[in-house]
Structures are given as C-alpha cells and as structure tokens.
Amino acid sequence: MRIILLGAPGAGKGTQAQFISSTFSIPQISTGDMLRAAINEGTPLGLEAKKVMDAGKLVSDEIILGLVKERLSKSDCKNGCLFDGFPRTIAQADALKNDCIQIDHVIDIEVDDEEIIKRMSGRRVHPASGRTYHVLFNPPAKEGVDDITGDPLVQREDDCEETVRKRLDIYHKETAPLIEYYREYKKNGGPNALKFSTIKGTGSVESIKEKILNIFHN
C-alpha cells in the first residue's frame, strides 16, 4: 500500500504520518532523507544531486524520481510506503504516473489558513532543551519563560506569521493543485483507481487518527 499525504505546512501531516507509518509498518519516505542518504552513500544519483546543490541550484525532478525508484526497490518498501513531502508539484505527480508507480491512497488533511497561522505563530521554544510551548494551547506556567529553567522562550523564524503566510502562498500555488489532480485521477482511473479522501485536520490528534483509520477500513 502506497500512500501520499497532502496538506499545508502546519496541518499536522508529521504527526499523522508517524501514526500511519507505525500502524501499517511501512516506511515514511522523505525526499530530504533520500537526498541525504544518497549523498552520504556516494551513489551516482547522490553525487549528481550534490553537484547540483553545491552549485546552489534546485535538484531536478528527474533526479528526485530516480531516488524515489531506488528507495522503492529496497526490502522495507515491499508492503508499501508513505510519501512525505512528495510529490510537491503536478510535474512530479505526472512523472510518478508516467513511470507506472502505483499509488493506492491519497489523503488530504484540510485546515484553514487562519487556523494554521494561529497554530504555528503561537509556538514558542526553549532552545537549549527543545521543549515546545504554545501561547494558546500549551502555555508555560509563566508567560515567555521555560517551566524548568526559567530561560526566555523564543519564536523560531519559521513560525513567524510573515514566514508562515509565505509558506502557505507557496503551498497554494505549487502543491494545492495536486488535490484536484488526484481527485480527477480517482474519477478517471477505472477499477484500480487510487482512493482519494479529504479529512478535516481540526480537533484532537486522536480524533484525526480515527478519521484516517476509517478511510482504510471502509
């Protein structure tokens, strides 16, 4: 079973990806992890990717797809995998389809932009320990300081509202079109078509896990 998880940054994909991976005993495949592994192992594709990255350029879809195919050939993928952050664009989705890489489920976790901004911009971190708080949902005992050490908490640059809005803009331009792409793919795919589902990513983590399990049990 091969699964693609879609959703904007901050929609909760990371938490649910870990849940799906452990529940179905399938690896979570990240293009970033694949790139790092290929570079560290010195594979031909890894060396090619390193050359491109060292030149400050983006790694091509051709290289990424080559890495995906290499990864899928490994024994831990024999029962399937969960794609994390791939595909990001229609071109990458087309490349998957053209290479006859079968996808079984696409799950879109839907959360409104303003809810995502509230979630992400409210995060505060204790840099030394990594302890994470949220000004609304998990506030420290004393505003602005770590519960254990009393050190000041910080807001990571990635969590600043302006940065979050920019990331959401990129998502809506580049990745959100995949939702309609896979919805159409499901309609036109015949008896072996993939299953496409949209779930609301609001509510408790456990309630969202339950929604995901229902997709696979129906």
Curated annotation (Swiss-Prot):
Q: Which residues bind ATP?
A: 10-15, 123, 132-133, 203
Known EC number: 2.7.4.3
> Region LID: start and end of each range?
122-159
Q: In which pathway does it act?
A: Purine metabolism; AMP biosynthesis via salvage pathway; AMP from ADP: step 1/1
Location in the cell reads: Cytoplasm
Q: A GO CC term?
A: cytoplasm
* Catalysed reactions, as listed in the record: AMP + ATP = 2 ADP
Q: Which domain of life is it from?
A: Bacteria
Question: GO MF annotations for this entry?
Answer: adenylate kinase activity; ATP binding
Indicate whether ATP-binding appears among the record's keywords. Answer: yes
Q: What does this protein do?
A: Catalyzes the reversible transfer of the terminal phosphate group between ATP and AMP. Plays an important role in cellular energy homeostasis and in adenine nucleotide metabolism.
Q: What is known of its domains?
A: Consists of three domains, a large central CORE domain and two small peripheral domains, NMPbind and LID, which undergo movements during catalysis. The LID domain closes over the site of phosphoryl transfer upon ATP binding. Assembling and dissambling the active center during each catalytic cycle provides an effective means to prevent ATP hydrolysis.
Q: What is this protein called?
A: Adenylate kinase
Gene of origin?
Answer: adk
